């Protein structure tokens, strides 16, 4: 069977965010690689100078759906833009990241929305 790049790209285009996430994880496991971007080494500013970088990207982790699962699914849909089935699967699969690599203010707002819906969520 010959590899057809166009068919592959079309298949990728039709996948949901959750399916793409599962694909990335499978590729990472299969080939022993990481999808994380490589950071350039920081230039040394002198001996003993400690550089403390403030974290700029945060992940919103749903740890538990809680008693009011319907409200949590609605909150997840608002935060992520996922469809009903994808949001339900994400909530059922807790603990899972709801959003990854977002700004601190957006992450805090998402955690607050999940907590208000009755879920247990963390900012990572």
Curated annotation (Swiss-Prot):
Q: Subunit structure, per the record?
A: Homodimer. Part of the ribosomal stalk of the 50S ribosomal subunit. Forms a multimeric L10(L12)X complex, where L10 forms an elongated spine to which 2 to 4 L12 dimers bind in a sequential fashion. Binds GTP-bound translation factors.
Single GO MF descriptor: mRNA binding
The record's annotation in CDD domains points to: Ribosomal_L7_L12
GO annotation, cellular component aspect: cytosolic large ribosomal subunit
Disulfide bonding pattern of the chain: none
Which biological process, per GO, is one annotated for this protein? translation
Which keywords does the record carry?
Ribonucleoprotein, Ribosomal protein
Q: What is this protein called?
A: Large ribosomal subunit protein bL12
InterPro entries (UniProt xref): Ribosomal_bL12, Ribosomal_bL12_C, Ribosomal_bL12_C/ClpS-like, Ribosomal_bL12_oligo, Ribosomal_bL12_oligo_N_sf
Asked if the keyword Ribonucleoprotein belongs to this entry, the reply reads yes
> What gene is behind this protein?
rplL
Identify the SUPFAM superfamilies for this entry. ClpS-like, Ribosomal protein L7/12, oligomerisation (N-terminal) domain
Please state which protein family the record places this protein in. Belongs to the bacterial ribosomal protein bL12 family.
User: What Pfam family is a match, any one?
Assistant: Ribosomal_L12_N
Function noted in UniProt: Forms part of the ribosomal stalk which helps the ribosome interact with GTP-bound translation factors. Is thus essential for accurate translation.
UniProt cross-references to PANTHER family, sorted A to Z? 39S RIBOSOMAL PROTEIN L12 (PTHR45987), LARGE RIBOSOMAL SUBUNIT PROTEIN BL12M (PTHR45987:SF4)
Keyword Ribonucleoprotein annotated? yes
